[in-house]
Regions:
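Short amphipathic alpha-helical segments with coiled-coil-like heptad repeat character
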Residues: 205-210, 352-354, 460-469
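Short coil/turn segments at secondary-structure boundaries
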Residues: 153-155, 269-277, 355-359, 452-458, ...
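N-terminal-proximal low-complexity accessory segments that begin disordered
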Residues: 1-97, 502-503
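Extended, charged amphipathic alpha-helical segments
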Residues: 231-370, 411
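C-terminal amphipathic alpha-helical
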Residues: 130-153, 329-431, 484-485
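C-terminal anchoring/interaction modules
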Residues: 2-15, 368-369, 384-503
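Short amphipathic alpha-helical coiled-coil/interface segments
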Residues: 110, 337, 341, 470-473
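Structured, mid-chain assembly/scaffold modules that mediate subunit interfaces
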Residues: 74-237, 443
Length: 503
């Protein structure tokens, strides 16, 4: 019954009809014609490709941070928007495992001690240089610039809380190390030992030195094997089997570098033309006079003179002077550069105007739309950072904290019920805050948002804590005889007083 599909279509009439060509459905982008022949096959973000290219991309990304104004701005924006002043802990310890009731005493206790630990550089950093917020900013910068951030956890440290952290440069983890793992069930991929079946990280191999007593030799190189439980490794995963990260700006690096070189060439050309005001021409058959003028100090003033306003050149008989009009900087440079920077900003996922510091022709609506898209991207990055860095650090800190006498009356067996938490990342103020505050007030009034959600948007504070503080402030005002400012009703402008008898 399906023989119809096997018959070729006849084109034309009569016995001399010819068989027509059969149409084949296919993706146009998969064609291998002349136009697309330079488009080579790409295997994606495979471990093999990353091992071959990571070191080069990473060093070039670091160079751009040093020498490119735009990329320096991007890395600064990245760490300030992802981390900012740090993350605020919102502990949610329950009375018992499975009980939704919050243990308020334990909540205040845990939040206070974690805040105290995170502010103390000697407690947080093995080097004693960074608080937890500063360490997070450094890790975020490494994540953007090098493609990954790495922290080693030092448990049972000789400190009050027993936990210290150490930031490690990503290039200390050898991306070219591949082979058999520590056991038959593991394999090493780009310096990371993973389980063959689950692909879960088991250990990390860091470059060691021959004098390091903890180093083991592998392929004639010393390495230090660190269990995955003691390593915090953040990177953006583009492939399921990917074990290492690549710089987040990899798609824009090439164009940004070429644009920097173009800028330099344009600047050199402009400077050269600015320094060359004109050219002297000797008459025919008298070119030897140039040599004589160069030998005679007094006469050489004809050839090389200082350019001063209102002065004219006095030339020997027969000589000529050709003034040069600078052609650089080219009038089209600005529009061309802005177009290229838009592509670079798109590859970085940032808003162009702020990235390029170009606010010409920008309207409020366009800034708002671009800012919203950029903040959506940063919000996702904040979630990733909390999930991969901040949350594991807190869990490790809490486990160590409960083993210390400072944690009394809480003990290690309370870990399960106390390890309920969330972290509030930094938020942003709006360009027109009055309208946004009014919109939030309407949302709360109609039940579209809660006071807790709105409070979290403004600095990450806690609504219940705000209520307690407001109660204390109102009591203090009442005791001091200070009247509370009247509330503004709908349709009333700030500062407008009601007339007597007006309701």
């Amino acid at each position: 019954m399906f023989g119809f599909f096997n018959r070729a279509k006849k084109v034309g009439k009569g016995p001399t009809a010819v068989t027509g060509a059969q149409a084949v459905r296919s993706f146009g982008v998969a064609e291998m014609g002349r136009e697309l022949s330079p488009w080579v096959f790409d295997g994606g973000f495979s471990n093999v490709e990353i091992a071959a290219a990571l070191a080069t991309i990473r060093t070039r990304s670091r160079d751009m941070q040093k020498n490119s104004p735009q990329f320096s701005q991007y890395f600064r924006q990245f760490k300030n928007n992802v981390v900012g002043r740090g993350f605020t802990l919102r502990a949610q310890p329950c009375e018992a495992v499975g009980d939704p009731a919050i243990d308020e005493a334990a909540k205040a206790f845990i939040q206070y001690h974690f805040w105290k630990w995170s502010k103390d550089r000697d407690e947080v950093d093995l080097t004693g240089r960074k608080s937890f917020a500063r360490m997070c900013r450094l890790v975020a910068e490494n994540w953007a610039r090098d493609g990954e951030g790495i922290i080693l956890i030092e448990r049972n440290a000789p400190t009050v809380y027993g936990l210290q952290l150490r930031v490690v440069r990503p290039d200390a983890l050898d991306e070219k190390m591949n082979g058999q793992g520590f056991t038959a069930n593991t394999v090493i991929r780009n310096g990371v030992e993973i389980d063959r079946r689950t692909k879960r990280p088991i250990a990390y191999y860091f470059n060691g030195t021959a004098e390091d007593p903890m180093a083991a030799w592998y392929n004639s190189k010393p390495y230090v094997r660190v269990p995955a439980s003691d390593v915090i490794h953040i990177f953006t995963q583009h492939d399921e089997c990917q074990t290492r990260g690549i710089p987040l700006g990899h798609a824009s690096l090439k164009k940004a570098k070429m644009l920097d070189e173009f800028d330099l060439s344009e600047l050199v050309a402009a400077r050269d033309e600015a320094n060359t005001t004109g050219i002297f021409h000797a008459p025919a058959d008298r070119e030897d006079e140039i040599k004589k003028l160069n030998e005679d100090t007094a006469a050489s003033n004809y050839v090389c003179q200082k350019s001063e306003p209102g002065t004219k050149y006095v030339l020997p008989p027969g000589w000529d002077y050709d003034p040069k009009t600078p052609q650089h900087p080219n009038r089209e440079v600005s529009s061309f550069k802005n177009s290229m920077l838009r592509d670079v900003a798109s590859g970085l996922g940032v808003e162009y105007a702020c990235f390029a510091n170009d606010w010409a022709g920008v309207s409020f609506s366009s800034v708002r739309a671009g800012t919203l898209a950029e903040r959506d991207n940063y919000t996702t990055l904040q979630d990733d950072f909390v999930e991969m860095v901040v949350a594991p650090v807190f869990k490790a800190w809490l486990a160590q904290f409960l083993t210390r006498t400072i944690a009394n009356p809480y003990v290690p067996s309370d870990f399960a019920r106390l390890c309920e938490f969330e972290f509030q990342a930094r938020t942003w103020a709006w360009v027109d805050p009055m309208k946004d505050v009014q919109a939030d007030a309407i949302a709360v009034e109609h039940g579209w948002k809660t006071n807790e959600e709105v409070t979290a948007q403004y600095g990450g504070s806690d609504f219940k804590e705000n209520c307690a503080r407001l109660a204390e402030e109102n009591a203090a005002k009442k005791q001091a005889g200070i009247l509370t400012a009247p509330q503004i009703t709908k349709g009333e402008k700030p500062g407008k007083e009601k007339d007597e008898g007006e309701e």
